[in-house]
UniProtKB/Swiss-Prot annotation:
One Gene Ontology term from the biological process aspect of the record: regulation of DNA-templated transcription
InterPro entries: Integrase-like_N, TACO1_YebC-like_2nd/3rd_dom, TACO1_YebC_N, Transcrip_reg_TACO1-like, Transcrip_reg_TACO1-like_dom3, YebC-like
Species the sequence originates in: Desulfatibacillum aliphaticivorans
Protein name listed in UniProt: Probable transcriptional regulatory protein Dalk_2958
Location (main, coarse): cytoplasm
Record-linked SUPFAM superfamilies: YebC-like
Amino acid sequence: MSGHNKWSTIKHKKGAADAKRGKVFSKLIKEITIAARMGGGDPDANPRLRTAINAAKAENMPKDNWERAIKKGTGELEGVNYEEFQYEGYGPGGGAVLVESLTDNKNRAAAEIRHIFSKCGGSLGEAGCVAWMFDKKGYIVVNQSVTDEDTLMEIALEAGAEDVREAGDVFEVITQPDDYDAVKEAIDAAGIETEDASVTKLPQNTVEVTGKEAEQMVRLLQTLDDCDDVQNVYTSADIPDDAIGED
């Protein structure tokens, strides 16, 4: 596994605009609902739900909102029946793209995702064509201005992290999914502020994408992420900072 998770950086830069459009809350509510449906409404016994609730709290979602989403997932309240699907393909420049969809209409989602790939210069592939290139990991980003590497490494590794590495002006903490909560809590307890933290999928290897293809790749990723039926987008593309535009 190598390379900075650039798509996470892109989403972080664009996060404020997404929040204004309500997309962050909408995606979190979907995730909480399906996590509760699949694993029950007790976050202590449901790691996926616990992670989703923590993400909602980090975005300052009102407690009533996520509690209602849990009840819809467990059936206590009537709600939309979301299903999970995965789409795989390649973007401009050859970077792998993995798309996770939570939708109440598979046909609509598939058609829209296929259209986005085509419109933005990508190609949608068969199931299994790129999923094997990604590993599910806990991923925590800490700016180097708030702590030093030795301090962060000691805290993170003691809590169960598998790696701490330098990437530009940040440190990346990598964990197994089951260890993510404990590591994040240990970093928070030490008073170290995090820039980004989630259970995500990281590429085992990255593909450098530059120039016009990098700009096209960013457009593909952002258009996919803006789709209401898309929950998460992952890529193996290593995109230069100058291709990552501000909103």
